[in-house]
A protein has these predicted regions:
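Long, internal low-complexity/basic segments
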Residues: 1-5, 12, 16-17, 42, ...
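Active-site segment of extracytoplasmic enzymes that catalyze sulfate/phosphate-ester chemistry
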Residues: 9-10, 16-106, 117, 125-140
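Short, solvent-exposed turn/loop segments enriched in Gly/Ser/Thr/Pro and often Arg
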Residues: 22-24, 41-64, 72, 107-119, ...
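Histidine-centered active-site microenvironments of extracellular/periplasmic hydrolases
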Residues: 28, 119-122, 129, 191-194, ...
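Polar, surface-exposed loop/tail segments
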Residues: 30, 60, 101, 110, ...
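Substrate-binding rim/cap in mid-to-C-terminal beta-strand-loop elements of soluble/periplasmic
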Residues: 61, 132-149, 222-230, 251-255, ...
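Formylglycine-dependent
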Residues: 71-100, 112-240, 448
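C-terminal, low-complexity/hydrophilic appendages and adjacent surface loops
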Residues: 296-297, 307-309, 369-412, 447-459
C-alpha cells in the first residue's frame, strides 16, 4: 500500500463552472485553481447528473443516478423525519471502498446526505457542517465532530481547512489517505463574506456575467426571490469573494501536503455538486431556482480539474483541456480506477476516463449527456438539448449552436419533430435500462419527503 496514491477530493457547493480564471473569467482571482489547471487536466464539458445539492453529492459518492439511489432533492436536515432516514443505506460509497482497501479516510465540510453530525460509513475522521440551515459564512456555528456537535467561532472555510490540515498532520504515515473536503462559501446567502475580499470586487465590471437576462419559461424561486435581486452587483461581489476564499483554502491544503512531503504522491480532484446562475437567464440559483425546475447550462455544468502530483515524473503533456462529456458518475469510477480499486458489481451508468488523463482517446466515448431532477429529465448533445417534464410538460428543445443562451424553445417547430421523437425515445431507453423503478424520479410524489418545498408537491 506504500505506493498507492493519496486521493484528495474537493466537492464544493454551488461553485459554477464559469467562476474560475482558468475557465475564462477575466476578473476572478483564482491562482490556486489556475495552477491546478495549468499543471493538470481541466474538463470543459463536465456536468452534474442532477442540479441540486444532496442528490448530486450522492451521485458522486455512490456513482449512481438519483433514480438509482433514490435521493431526489436537497435534504432539510432540521426536519427530524428527514434526518431519521438512512438515505444511502443500501449504497456503497467511495469512502467505504477506500477504507476497505486500507486507506485512512476523512470527511471535512459539507456532507448534506443526512445525519450530518455522525460519521458516514467508511470514514475514520469526521468534521461536517451541522444541521443549522441556512448556514452563515462566519460563526459561531455548530459542527458535527465524530458523532457529537461542537460549536466553533470563525469563518467556516477556515475551520474546514484547519481540521483537514490537522488530519493530514496526524495521519498514519504508513497508509495512504482518501479525504473529501466540502467548502460552502459559494452557497447563498451571498452576503457575509470577507469584507476585504468583497471590497476588492465591488468595482469589477462583472462583464463575464450576462446582464439583464430574463427567464421566459417559468417563475423565479428560492434564492431568486431574496434580497439578492435587489442588489445584484453586491451579490456578485460577495460571490466572487467566496470563490477567492475557497481558492485560498485549497491552496492552504496543497501547501500542507507539500510541507509533509505528500504532494508528489497525491491526486487532487476539484469539482462542485452542481453549477450556479448569478443572474444568468435572470436566475439566482441552480435547478430549483425556477418553477418549473430548470436544466439551463449554468445549472448543470460543473468545474472539474484533476491534478496528479506524480505527473512530474510521467510522460504526460500538460496542461490538458478535455472536451469530452463527463459527469459525477464517470468521476466516481475514475477515482476508483486510478487507485486500482475495483467497483462493486452494480448497474453503473458511468465509465472510467482515466485514459483521458493520460492524453489518450477512448473509443466510442458518449456524445450525449443525460440528467434528471425529480420528474424532469434531460438529454443534451453537442447541438441540442431536450428538457422533458413528466407527465404533462411544459417541455423544451433548444438549439445550443444557434441559441446558446437558451431563450428560444423550438420544441413545437415542425422541422424539429424527428429530433424530438428520437430524443424522447433515447431518453426513455436510457432510464429504462438504468433506473430502479422503486426509486425512479417519475414517482417522487410517492417517495419520502426531502423538504417542505419540493417542486412536485408545491408547484
Amino acid at each position: 500500500m506504500a505506493t498507492a496514491p493519496n486521493i484528495l477530493l474537493f466537492l464544493t457547493d454551488d461553485h459554477a463552472q464559469w467562476a474560475m480564471g482558468c475557465a475564462g473569467n477575466s476578473e476572478l482571482r483564482t491562482p490556486t485553481f489556475d495552477y491546478l489547471a495549468q499543471n493538470g487536466t481541466r474538463f470543459a464539458n463536465a456536468f452534474t447528473p442532477i442540479p441540486v445539492c444532496s442528490p448530486a453529492r450522492a451521485c458522486l459518492h455512490t456513482g449512481r443516478l438519483a433514480s438509482q439511489h433514490g435521493l431526489h432533492d436537497y435534504l432539510n436536515s432540521n426536519d427530524p423525519a428527514v434526518n431519521s432516514i438512512h438515505w444511502l443505506e443500501n449504497e456503497t460509497t467511495l469512502a467505504q471502498l477506500f477504507q476497505a482497501a486500507g486507506y485512512q479516510t476523512g470527511q471535512f465540510g459539507k456532507w448534506h446526505l443526512g445525519q450530518d453530525e455522525h460519521a458516514a460509513a467508511g470514514y475514520d475522521e469526521w468534521f461536517s457542517l451541522g444541521r443549522d440551515y441556512p448556514i452563515p459564512h462566519e460563526g459561531p456555528f455548530r459542527y458535527g465532530v465524530n458523532g457529537r456537535f461542537q460549536t466553533l467561532p470563525g469563518r467556516i472555510s477556515h475551520n474546514i481547512t484547519e481540521h483537514a490540515a490537522q488530519f493530514l498532520r496526524a495521519r498514519d504515515a504508513e497508509r495512504p489517505f482518501f479525504m473529501t473536503v466540502g467548502y460552502y462559501a459559494t452557497h447563498s446567502p451571498w452576503q457575509g463574506q470577507s469584507e476585504r475580499l468583497a471590497a476588492s470586487y465591488r468595482n469589477a465590471t462583472f462583464a463575464d456575467v450576462p446582464q439583464n437576462e430574463t427567464y421566459p419559461f417559468g417563475r423565479q424561486a428560492l434564492e431568486s426571490l431574496n434580497e439578492t435581486r435587489h442588489n445584484p452587483r453586491e451579490a456578485l461581489a460577495q460571490y466572487y469573494a467566496a470563490v477567492t476564499e475557497i481558492d485560498t483554502a485549497v491552496g492552504r491544503l496543497i501547501d500542507e501536503l507539500e510541507s509533509l512531503g505528500q504532494l508528489e504522491n497525491t491526486i487532487i480532484i476539484y469539482t462542485a455538486d452542481h453549477g450556479l446562475n448569478t443572474g444568468h437567464h435572470g436566475i439566482w440559483g441552480k435547478g430549483n431556482g425556477t418553477l418549473p425546475l430548470n436544466m439551463v447550462e449554468e445549472s448543470i455544468r460543473v468545474p472539474l480539474i484533476w491534478y496528479d502530483g506524480r505527473s512530474a515524473s510521467a510522460d504526460v503533456p500538460l496542461p490538458q483541456i478535455r472536451t469530452e462529456f463527463v459527469d459525477h458518475l464517470d468521476t466516481f469510477l475514475t477515482i476508483l480506477d486510478v487507485a486500482g480499486i475495483a467497483p462493486p458489481d452494480k448497474n453503473y451508468v458511468g465509465r472510467t476516463y482515466q485514459r483521458l488523463l493520460h492524453n489518450q482517446t477512448i473509443p466510442e466515448w458518449r456524445a450525449v449527456q443525460f440528467g434528471e431532477y425529480g420528474n424532469v429529465r434531460m438529454l443534451r448533445t453537442s447541438r441540442h438539448k431536450l428538457v422533458y417534464r413528466y407527465p404533462d410538460g411544459p417541455n423544451e428543445l433548444f438549439d445550443l449552436a444557434a441559441d446558446p443562451r437558451e431563450m428560444n424553445n423550438i420544441i413545437n417547430r415542425e422541422d424539429m419533430q424527428t429530433i424530438v421523437q428520437a430524443f424522447i425515445e433515447r431518453l426513455e431507453g436510457f432510464f429504462t435500462r438504468y433506473e430502479d423503478p422503486a426509486k425512479s424520479g417519475l414517482r417522487v410524489r410517492d417517495l419520502p419527503r426531502h423538504n417542505s418545498s419540493e417542486a412536485w408537491r408545491t408547484s
